[in-house]
């Protein structure tokens, strides 16, 4: 699989992680219907809901998203999620390669608290993802109530 070492992917990753940049997500897709070359498809500032609207039901795509949430009135947390999107209309051979290829993408987007496997846009519900991040972070101040 090639294309993951592209400088625009590294720059987008750095932008999502930066506290000084408004970019909150990036999306990586296959460059064409055949072959294994990956490319940066898009970035955005609108969080999880905007990212979900950009996913393609006929593709496997990988995303990296910044999630900010408050545990209480005085603390704000910033965490990152890695999203593996397998659209409902994705070809079988693309689906079959996800387990191998996702590990290569994770090497390029290494720092994340959770991995979200999604095949419906509803799987990217911000409240559910925040609950998972709280549990993964070990600082769930809501007594298990999410």
Spans of features found by a protein language model:
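Long, low-complexity regulatory segments enriched in Ser/Thr/Pro/Gly and acidic residues
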Residues: 1-146
